[in-house]
Amino acid sequence: MFTLPPISLYIHIPWCLKKCGYCDFYSYVSKEIIPENKYIEHLLRDFERDLSLINNRNINTIFIGGGTPSLLKNTSIKNLLNGIKKRKIISKNIEISIEANPKTLEYQNFIQYKNSGINRFSLGIQTFNSKMLKKIERTYNSKDAMNAIIESKKISDNINLDLMYGLPGQSLEEALSDLQIAIQCNPSHISWYQLTIEPNTVFYAKKIQTPHQDVVFNMLIEGDKLLKKAGYKKYEISSYSKFNYQCQHNLNYWNFGDYIGIGCGSHGKITQKNGEIIRTIKNKNINDFLSGKYINSVYQVSKRDKIFEYFMNVFRLYKPIFKKHFRENTNIEESFIEKNIQIAIQEGFLINQSDCWHTTKKGKNFLNSLLEIFLK
């Protein structure tokens, strides 16, 4: 029997202090006063509109991302969350996360965020190395980063640090030094991911070079060892947590759960009662969004795209992929992908068992090659 998956809420705040050269996320540099009150008002209207699509499900997690959400006043964040809570569709033990730039944070921010219901803080540190921070065009220094961590830990024990490796000119020793500093700070969660330079970025246009792939691979391998030794469990390709501190919002994405996306440039995935999945794409033009034109497009995901998107997410996790889970979340029988599965097994990417599939070490290391099999 087909059942609707859990559903989350993603809220996009598009403004930033500065557009970093490597960033391909949708954002605006805030050169003028941000129209906070108006934006919050339209976020709530956008939210109201999407509620008609979710079939009375409760929202299990909320993630406020960007951009730089911590640019908004604390009262704006509070008004936003209060407006959402009024609908009374929020799960009792909901995880509410906010992304934050160390440059924009003070102790008072964390207190007021917590009072608003936020119980998880994700700090975009990226690196503690001042030289590297300048290279990747971040707006803060290593002292700002440490201060943000110290202040956040006074308020919450549910702290994520975002760190990148493979930065331009970065050595193995420098990458591991970042990790060692992060581990000493003892956050509950560390996201340790490789910098990739996407085509629509300033770094791509400038032909900025990252370290050789062998050096980057060694960063990953040695970083894995450091994190494991320090008590962090790797549960996803770039995610490591202490016991019981996995990011529930991201886990919902990776388990192919549903999510509403509200805000300028956001997108959503919402499963219908008949098993079909629709995608919502919101307007990227801030002026249009603030005039009530929220939707850019809504479309139904094709059967083949549904399969690819499912595996693109679940293959990131370090756990078995149960065949029952595939059926329940795609409304497709596994016999439809039997040929694809056999090719993946022959290539050494997957192991087949009676009730599940396992990705091999080779499958994780060559994830793109594994995913290409499910495009056919």
From Swiss-Prot:
S-adenosyl-L-methionine 1 binds at residues 10, 66, 99. GO terms for biological process: porphyrin-containing compound biosynthetic process. PROSITE patterns: RADICAL_SAM (PS51918). S-adenosyl-L-methionine 2 binds at residues 67-68, 126, 138, 162. Transmembrane segments: none annotated. The keyword Secreted does not apply. InterPro entries: Aldolase_TIM, Coproporphyrinogen-III_oxidase, Elp3/MiaA/NifB-like_rSAM, HemN_C, HemW-like, rSAM. Keywords: 4Fe-4S, Chaperone, Cytoplasm, Heme, Iron, Iron-sulfur, Metal-binding, S-adenosyl-L-methionine. Its cofactor is [4Fe-4S] cluster. GO terms for molecular function: 4 iron, 4 sulfur cluster binding; coproporphyrinogen oxidase activity; metal ion binding. The keyword Chaperone applies. [4Fe-4S] cluster binds at residues 16, 20, 23. Its main location: cytoplasm. Probably acts as a heme chaperone, transferring heme to an unknown acceptor. Binds one molecule of heme per monomer, possibly covalently. Binds 1 [4Fe-4S] cluster. The cluster is coordinated with 3 cysteines and an exchangeable S-adenosyl-L-methionine. This is Heme chaperone HemW. It comes from Buchnera aphidicola subsp. Acyrthosiphon pisum (strain APS) (Acyrthosiphon pisum symbiotic bacterium).
